[in-house]
Design a protein with these regions (language model features):
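Blade/loop signatures of beta-propeller domains
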Residues: 20-56
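Conserved blade-ending motifs and adjacent loop-strand segments that build the rim/top face
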Residues: 249-271, 325-359
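Blade-loop segments of beta-propeller domains
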Residues: 57-63, 67, 95-122, 130, ...
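Short beta-strand elements that form the blades of beta-propeller/WD-repeat-like
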Residues: 76-82, 123-129, 166-177, 218-238, ...
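Beta-strand-rich domains and repeat architectures in extracellular enzymes and scaffolds
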Residues: 38, 50-85
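Structural signature of eukaryotic scaffold interfaces centered on beta-propeller domains
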Residues: 67-73, 114-121, 159-166, 209-224, ...
């Protein structure tokens, strides 16, 4: 009898050990588990180095207001899209290379430019215009046009963004009471390869309560040539494989902090509910995301008011980083007022948060020249940072911040 009991205990223990040794699902982003554990995160924890690269300023290349932070870095070139839809290109060292503005109604021009994307192999620029995508070389030469509205099915949808992946295009569509599709994969002839539907249960809520639209818009981002799709408040981030099939790339666990789309008070500024907002960026090791956290924040961020209005306001969003290799999720505290992101502990610069992540593993953002100079005057910075500031004029072009991320 004693032997039987001993065997039973060993069997139970073995089962428990095996259960505890189950491999961790590295797709799971435990947002709920990150609440109450926010901390300052140093840039050196996720990066190898940082560079500040002033963009050359001359009569041909005066960078105006950048259109919704549309900045890219691929193939050794920086691309900035201005508010007037001019695309200004500088090389790896910040030297002016070219300026492209093909605004017009000709067959090789764009009548509008809603956004752009960069071909990761050639460095060519593709522009999303009305009903078509036009591609130009770095020199500004016309390469080709893809009239996606030639596809009768696509002509019924309003395209807001796109990602060019090799010879394919993923088009992000708005959702409304006439269309439940959040995106389409097409080839270079506008042939439809794949449609991505907005989740049915969420779609019904969005079309019933139009006020939710701005929160529940679908989002796309990329990791190299992989297209990622996030449908509103849905917990899944999808990815499109090379064979045009769809897989789950990541799964959010919002737990008790998941908002109910049918309860409007869940979306008030200080509501204690979490949802993914703004744009996500991804490198080989990290996923960078911003979430509404409302009153859940350990230390709410403070930002300066704009438009000549003095004072501060509570910024009810928190930056975060997810380590794809360890499965660790971390909310990031604000380093100081009016700054968001990682503590810049290499040269003493301001906090760093991506506006782009390149296919070769660089986090990219930028600073206006007058802001760069002001930071050098009010903070303890390295000799290198101060030297760059001393050689800038307030009216110079922006300074690119290029961070080499760890792999």
């Amino acid at each position: 009898m004693k032997k039987l009991i001993l065997i039973f205990i060993i069997a139970i223990t073995s089962c428990q050990n095996n259960s505890g040794n189950q491999p961790k699902d590295l797709r799971l982003i435990d947002v709920e588990g990150g609440v109450g554990k926010s901390r300052l995160v140093k840039l050196s924890e996720i990066a190898e180095s940082i560079e500040y690269i002033p963009l050359e300023t001359n009569s041909e290349a005066v960078v105006g207001k950048i259109f919704f932070d549309r900045i890219f870095y691929e193939k050794g070139f920086f691309y900035l899209m201005e508010q007037n839809r001019t695309i200004i290109i500088h090389d790896n060292d910040g030297k002016y290379f070219n300026k492209i503005n093909k605004l017009g109604r000709g067959p090789q021009e764009y009548d509008a430019a809603f956004t752009v994307d960069i071909d990761l192999k050639t460095g060519n620029i593709s522009v999303l215009a009305s009903n078509k995508i036009i591609e130009y070389s770095l020199d500004g030469d016309f390469k080709k046009v893809m009239n996606y509205k030639d596809n009768g099915f696509l002509s019924k949808h309003y395209i807001t963004r796109f990602i060019k992946s090799d010879l394919k295009y993923f088009l992000l569509s708005t959702i409304n009471d006439r269309s439940q599709h959040s995106g389409f994969l097409i080839d270079s002839t506008a042939r439809l390869l794949l449609s991505v539907e907005y989740p049915g249960e969420d779609y019904e809520k969005v079309t019933t309560y139009s006020a939710l639209l701005s929160i529940m818009y679908p989002m796309i981002f990329r990791h190299k040539n992989a297209v990622r799709i996030k449908n509103g408040l849905n917990k899944y981030i999808l990815t499109i494989n090379e064979d045009n099939s769809i897989d789950t790339a990541y799964i959010f666990n919002f737990g008790k902090y998941a908002p109910d789309p049918l309860k409007r008070d869940h979306f008030r500024t200080h509501a204690p509910f979490i949802w993914n907002k703004f744009w996500n960026f991804e490198s080989d090791q990290y996923l960078f995301m911003t979430f509404h956290t409302g009153s859940l924040s350990d230390k709410p961020a403070k930002m300066f008011r704009k438009g000549g209005v003095e004072g501060e306001y509570d910024y009810n969003f928190e930056c975060s980083v997810f380590n794809k290799k360890t499965g660790e999720f971390q909310f990031i505290l604000q380093p100081e007022i009016n700054q968001l992101g990682f503590v810049e502990d290499f040269e003493g610069g301001p906090a760093v948060w991506p506006k782009y992540v390149s296919s070769d593993g660089y986090m990219i953002t930028y600073m206006d020249a007058h802001e760069f100079k002001a930071h050098a005057e009010t903070h303890e910075v390295s000799d290198k940072f101060k030297s760059i500031a001393d050689n800038l004029k307030d009216t110079d072009n922006p300074v690119i911040v290029r961070v080499k991320l760890k792999n």
